[in-house]
Amino acid sequence: MFRGGTPVSLDNKGRLAVPARYRETLISLCAGHLIVTADPSKCLLIYPQPVWEPIEQKLNSLSSFNPQTRSLQRLLVGNACDVEMDGVGRILVPPSLRAFAGLNKEVVLVGQGAKFELWDSEKWNLQMESALAFRDGIPQELEGFSL
């Protein structure tokens, strides 16, 4: 559904203009209602509301007695904010989430199938350098995978 990285700018109010190629899909899928939340990689995740709801339900159904699970619930659900595309296709990225991800004016919106990641441009470039160097190795489940 959503793929590719698109350099975009945040305006002085922290608004992001959603690239035109995604707007129609977002309007038909969720009437422009999106959820923005924090990601452990220090970027933001942006979900169409109907895609987010089962994720949130699953997270909330997990035991809060497991410290790792509770931390993830706090991070993802505790930071989740409802946002809505305005008439010209912009969303307001909440200040607390902009600070969390270290977002400045220049950002990259990265399609990840059913969701987006939003990265500060410099951090995104570092992520790509790391990925190209295979610093973390290739996951076992990808061994034998052919492109």
UniProtKB/Swiss-Prot annotation:
Xref: PANTHER family: TRANSCRIPTIONAL REGULATOR MRAZ
Gene3D superfamilies tied to this protein: Transcriptional regulator MraZ domain
The protein, known as: Transcriptional regulator MraZ
Xref: PROSITE patterns: SPOVT_ABRB (PS51740)
UniProt main location, coarse: cytoplasm
Residue stretches making up the SpoVT-AbrB domain: 5-51, 80-123
Gene name tied to this protein: mraZ
Source organism of this protein record: Nitrosospira multiformis (strain ATCC 25196 / NCIMB 11849 / C 71)
GO terms of molecular function: DNA-binding transcription factor activity; transcription cis-regulatory region binding
